[in-house]
Amino acid sequence: MLHLARKAFWPAPIPFPVLHVDTGHNFPELLAYRDRTVEELGLRLVVARVQDYIDDGRLRERTDGTRNPLQTIPLLDAIEEGGFDGVFGGGRRDEEKARAKERIVSLRDEFGQWDPRNQRPELWNLLNPRHRPGEHVRVFPLSNWTELDVWRYIEREDIALPGLYYAHEREVFLRDGMWLA
């Protein structure tokens, strides 16, 4: 996503801050990569930490240990505090059922909620980001990309990634002479 934003605004710098909702379950190598990239590109980084919300009693640690579902409140607070009326995300429709029905330009109401009845049609490449005061949009430019599209883009653009991305073990299977994940 960051690479696409750089290309979109080149030769000018990216004109908006980069937002990271930190679950506290990130690998140090990834945080170092994030910080190094932000510094190299001269970006302003906004970090909303789930742990801060747990420490303040605004969120409770889950019994299953995952913090992904806890990201919503820190995200909504960061959007409100930053005065953002739009947020870019890297979600893809092939990742899970909930994202499969997400629009590329997804309207959120004044409570940050997604209501399928309020979503606008996406006809051809016509997208409508209009919203009322208090609402915001989330924009998912990679919605129609597959994981393979992402990896091909990374290869084509020669984007450097932390080694951890290549070290993750995944379940794969062979079908019609191709390895699939």
Spell out what each predicted region is.
Residues 1-181:
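Nucleotide-activated chemistry modules centered on ATP-dependent adenylation/adenylyltransferase
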